[in-house]
Amino acid sequence: MIREKQFYKTFFVLALSLALQNLLIYSVNMMDTVMLGRYSQNAMSGVSLCNQVQFMLQMLVEGAGEGAVVLGAQYWGKNKLEPIPHIIGAALRFGGGMAVLMILIVRLAPGQLLGILSNEPLVIAEGVRYFQIISFSYIVFTVTHILVASLRSVGIVKLGYIISFSTLCINISLNYLLIYGNFGFPELGVRGAAIATLVSRCVELLIVLYYLKFRERQLRLTLKKLVFIDTSYIRDYMRVSLPVLLNQAQWGAAQMVQTGILGHLGGDVTAANAIAVQSYQVLSVVAYGASSAAGIVVGKTIGAGKQSELKKLVHTLEVLFSVIGVFTGLTIFLLRGPILKVFGGSLTESAYLLSMQFMAVIAVTTVGTSYQVACDNGIIRGGGDTAFSAKMNLISMWLIIVPLSALAAFRWNLAPVVVFFLLKWDQLYKIIPVSIRLHSWKWVRVVTRGDREECAQP
């Protein structure tokens, strides 16, 4: 274990900064769920289906951003910042292309897309109304997310939560006015929630552009630097990012399939899943913040050539991830009742009971998530091995989780809570392959130019 207090101070400042940013980001969707939940269960369920489709885009955009973070953190560790704008430019190209594709799919076939996830006509109708407006935010979200992630790779983390806090306030205010029709505004329901989120995303981008123009001093990013890049860096970027993108794509698709399985079990199950997932995202931000911080710390350590320090660093991080997981799981379990009270009286009795059961399941699986996701996406990916996660999740999700859960739901007709557990239990058993890979040290790689050979075992 590392004993220097400065390490823990630095790590937790970074982790909590990223956690706060994630909290504010997820709170935007959470407030949509809460405020629409008090308006109408069908509206809440419809928007939750749209959010699941958007989760696919979010996963792809995060994959595009993670490639820039892995490369950027190692270049930062080498005190070599010149290549980073070229890498960011490459990430924006790929992220923008994926956003345009998602817009076309959502605009051309919204009903058919949501029909895959639910067989409830009223829920689908609410989702289509939401899609008609929110799809315009996809490119804005993509550009903002990649820029903020890229700045994070060089230690600039405060911008993210400043942006997210500002847009959360705007989103809540506009939701209050436009969903319910307060203070003379029209009562727009799901369309009001979509308008509020679209405006919030536009404000996010404006804040980022202002920061880059007037405050950022390390990379000195300009539109010219991001457009006219050395295209040879695209190869570097794709070499690192392609496995991450493939992993994120299949993970996002798997989450849509999971939502579809639950969505075809009834409206109450759809509503309970929406509440459980949104609550988990908000309450697990410290675990994911620690994961992101670990990726930056490990990447910088390898980039600086300090492989001899990795064993102690990794052991310390493993302990921290485990403690955070237990704490997060207990928090989710204890706050189930208070969270559901926030949704008021719009939930049916069945949806309420299912929500309590689903959140109890998540409280258990979160302990595994905190350890194995942080070790995988934080340490292993931050160390330069971006392919392991893609292979593991491909096998786990498509050969075990999805087939078994589909059989449980539609062939064996098991209770919804059992199906929900079978959809989430991979978070527990993946501890084994992740731990084996972590302690093999085969993930330690330098991915920057001039040092691409695999590093010796620490």
Mark where each language-model region is:
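Small-residue-rich hydrophobic transmembrane alpha-helices
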Residues: 44-104, 141-160, 259, 272-336, ...
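Hydrophobic transmembrane alpha-helices of multi-pass small-molecule transporters
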Residues: 56-59, 171-175, 205-209, 282-285, ...
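Transmembrane helical elements of multi-pass membrane transporters/channels
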Residues: 13-32, 133, 167, 200-204, ...
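Short runs within selected transmembrane alpha-helices of multi-pass transporters and secretion channels
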Residues: 65, 134-153, 160-168, 193-208, ...
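Small-residue hotspots at the loop-to-helix junctions and early N-terminal turns
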Residues: 41-52, 127, 131, 267-282, ...
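N-terminal transmembrane alpha-helices
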Residues: 2-34, 38-39, 52-67, 71, ...
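Short alpha-helical transmembrane segments in multi-pass integral membrane proteins
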Residues: 1-18, 72-139, 185-241, 298-365, ...
